[in-house]
């Protein structure tokens, strides 16, 4: 497996990425998989290497990147918004289509973890260029997931905090959350 550090732009922010390629010469071009990391994950996390090694051994190129605001990518630090992550994934797909060593008609998405798996589903549903999607351990219902992480009294306290924060933001423009 060969690695190439690359970057592309997403809504004006430079996105840092790693393109992992199969060894050898492509048969014209490689089919590709794009992966946005899971919850707070980064492109160089060792967790993803076994997947990428298997995919490149099977003849796929793999693009993994740091979402904007994370790792080496530009953007507001630590902002986690699914719609921004979806834009980054969509722009990652567009970047792949610009490469001569990638088969632009054979691009898939792989996502692992709550946000990674959920974002893979969102991308596949919204981008006709995606031919296949693998979503491993997604959060499909965020409210249910947040609820199950708490005891009932903690859930009620959390809902009260959300409502108080909403009210504060409406009046002052800022809030806790």
Language-model segment annotations:
Residues 38-53, 67:
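The serine-hydrolase catalytic nucleophile loop
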């Amino acid at each position: 497996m060969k690695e190439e550090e690359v970057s592309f732009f997403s809504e004006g922010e430079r996105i840092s990425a790693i393109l992992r390629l199969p060894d050898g010469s492509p048969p014209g071009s490689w089919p590709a998989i794009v992966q946005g990391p899971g919850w707070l994950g980064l492109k160089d996390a060792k967790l993803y290497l076994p997947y990428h090694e298997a995919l490149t051994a099977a003849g796929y190129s793999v693009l993994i990147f740091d979402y904007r605001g994370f790792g080496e990518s530009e953007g507001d630090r630590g902002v986690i918004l699914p719609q921004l992550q979806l834009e980054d994934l969509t722009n990652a797909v567009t970047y792949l289509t610009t490469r001569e060593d990638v088969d632009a008609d054979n691009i898939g998405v792989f996502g692992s973890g709550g946000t990674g798996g959920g974002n893979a589903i969102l991308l596949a549903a919204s981008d006709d260029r995606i031919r296949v999607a693998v979503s491993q351990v997604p959060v499909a219902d965020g409210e249910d997931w947040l609820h199950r992480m708490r005891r009932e009294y903690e859930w009620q306290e959390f809902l009260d905090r959300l409502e108080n924060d909403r009210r504060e933001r409406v009046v002052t423009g800022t809030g806790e959350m």
